[in-house]
Swiss-Prot record:
GO terms for cellular component: cytoplasm. It is found in: Cytoplasm. It holds the Pfam family Urocanase_N. It catalyses: 4-imidazolone-5-propanoate = trans-urocanate + H2O. It comes from Fervidobacterium nodosum (strain ATCC 35602 / DSM 5306 / Rt17-B1). This is Urocanate hydratase.
Length: 549
């Protein structure tokens, strides 16, 4: 059993600069037991999304970062440190490529063969790019999605409404709190009792039961009283959902965040106990997958029937529709995706999951940055509400962090403000600034972020590559290009960026460029596809697009 990994706190450097210290601490933070789903196996979240290929690679990365100079760049190939090159101080300290395969070979079957041979690693999105911050990292996006549902169909609130979902892993675990933040009631089905316990411990889930009747009783009481409540139901969605249909119980909203993007490692079939399923997964993966496919069909057919009976349903980006379609559910895509339905207008403005982490380890540093957000953007009541709720309801996992959806212009303004706070000594230590790959201009994913693009450009993967190259050119601290995050191998290409606000003048220049250009590529991507909000945002911020000048 490997040692317990936790990032160092405070102002004592163990590397040669804060730029490399930050990379080391964030790698370690991804494997903090408070943060990672299965740290002993280097798994952070999302099925088998890992921080490093194996423990030898992890320790060698740490060792290399401690020696890395300010004009050198470490290259990471699928979680393995492969080279250090002399570059320059404006270059990233780390460049990462995870899980990338030539398209013809981009299948789970081939990927798994390579992984068994020790040649590749699944990096998910923020697992292999060292900027995962725990479930908070997806919380505001989930909150924004359910708020958009409420705004579109229920007058702006989920009060008195029942939401049904499944999956309480590191991503799906945000759903219960996001629903109750919107004043709704949610039943979240989960097969793994450990995940339910983890959500209760971290404050994302109110209560749990292993009895459907009890879950419905609790939900009915809360709905009648108009109070928010989140209920974890220990069970299997492929059994619970059809039973609800059989009883004629149709929730107001239905979605799903099981890890169906990885059928072998992420989805547990019905008709077998959880413990037996884990055993079968190892001993007979072919039989296991047969059972998974049968369960996914039942799961999605039940959601489709709920949709026909009036429920507002959407897929939450786990590619379960495609899996169901491939196994006989011809109308699986009658279920809309959440991005075109609820998030695309935000992406067109450049808004997305901006995040920052206090390297000091002190919550006070995050609270001070929260106050800075309110000083700069306090006229936005929705944003004020988010910061207020986050302070009250989000428990720290690993290094204290904050997620805050900011748009074009706002991210650069906030980044520069935090750098100035570090320079003046208002914060104890530098701040790491990053984002999810699930952002406005950094993903090509036809079943999620780029589903149903206005111009039909869903599958064009040039955009995340341009995004990554631009961030390298702009002075980011580390940049990553991944494949298969969110929706699974073969279905997405995406890029990540991190920059460290250390209070220096050089970093001030880098921050202004990176945080303007990174999000600006999202505006450009959507403007190029014909979205009027993005076109107007580009004009407002003086973004030069030769074909639109």
């Amino acid at each position: 059993m490997p040692e317990v990994i936790r990032a160092p706190r405070g102002t004592q450097l163990t590397c040669k600069s804060w730029q490399t210290e930050a990379a080391m601490r964030m790698l370690m933070n991804n494997l903090d037991p408070e943060v990672a789903r299965d740290p002993a196996n280097l798994i952070v979240y999302g099925g088998k999304g890992k921080a490093a290929r194996n423990w030898d690679c992890f320790y060698k990365i740490v060792e290399t970062l401690k020696k890395l100079e300010n004009d050198e760049t470490l290259l990471i190939q699928s979680g393995k440190p492969v080279a250090v090159w002399k570059t320059h101080e404006w270059a990233p300290r780390v460049l990462i490529a995870n899980s990338n395969l030539v398209p013809k070979w981009a299948t789970w079957e081939y990927f798994n063969e390579l992984e068994v041979r020790g040649l590749i690693m699944y990096g998910q999105m923020t697992a292999g790019s060292w900027i995962y911050i725990g479930t908070q990292g997806i919380l505001q996006g989930t909150y924004e999605t359910f708020y958009a549902v409420a705004k579109k169909y229920f007058g702006g609130t989920l009060k008195g409404k029942l939401v049904l979902t499944a999956g309480l892993g590191e991503m799906g675990g945000a759903q219960p709190l996001a629903v109750t933040m919107n004043d709704g009631v949610v039943i979240a089905v989960e097969v793994d009792k450990r995940m339910i316990d983890r959500r209760i411990q971290t404050g994302y889930l109110d209560t749990w039961t292993d009895n459907l009747d009890e879950a419905l009783r609790l939900a009915k009481e809360a709905l009648k009283e108009g109070r928010p409540l989140s209920i974890g139901l220990l069970g299997n969605a492929a059994e619970v959902h059809p039973e609800l249909v059989r009883r004629g119980i149709i929730p107001d909203v239905v979605t799903d965040q099981t890890a169906a993007h990885d059928p072998l490692n992420g989805y547990v079939p019905a008709g077998i106990s959880f413990e037996e399923a884990l055993k079968l997964r190892k001993e007979n993966p072919e039989k296991y997958l047969e059972m998974v496919y049968d369960s996914v069909v039942k799961h999605i057919e039940a959601i489709l029937e709920m949709q026909r009976q009036g429920a507002k349903v959407f897929e939450y980006g786990n590619n379960i529709r495609r899996l169901a379609l491939d196994h006989g559910v011809k109308d699986a895509f009658n279920i809309p995706g959440y991005v075109p339905e609820y998030i695309r207008d935000l992406f067109s403005e450049g808004k997305g999951p901006f995040r920052w982490v206090a390297l000091s380890g002190k919550p006070e540093d995050i609270y001070k940055t929260d106050q800075k957000v309110l000083e700069l953007f306090g006229e936005d009541e929705h944003l004020r509400k988010w910061i207020d709720m986050a302070q009250k309801k989000v428990k720290w996992q690993g290094l204290p962090a904050r997620i805050c959806w900011l748009g074009q212009g706002q991210r650069a303004e906030m980044g520069l403000a935090m750098n100035e706070m570090v320079r003046k000594g208002e914060l104890e230590a530098p701040i790491v600034i990053g984002r999810d790959h699930h952002d406005t201009g950094s993903v090509a994913s036809p079943y999620r972020e780029t589903e149903a693009m206005k111009d039909g450009s869903d599958a064009i993967a040039d955009w995340p590559l341009l995004n990554a190259m631009l961030n390298v050119a702009s002075g980011a601290t580390w940049v990553s290009i991944h494949h298969g995050g969110g929706v699974g191998i073969g279905y997405s290409i995406h890029a990540g960026v991190v920059i460290v606000a250390d209070g220096t003048e050089l970093t001030r220049q880098k921050l202004e460029r990176v945080l303007t250009n990174d999000v600006g590529m999202g505006v450009v991507r959507h403007a190029d596809a014909g979205y009027e909000i993005a076109i107007q945002t580009a004009k407002k911020h003086g973004i030069r697009m030769p074909m639109m000048d």
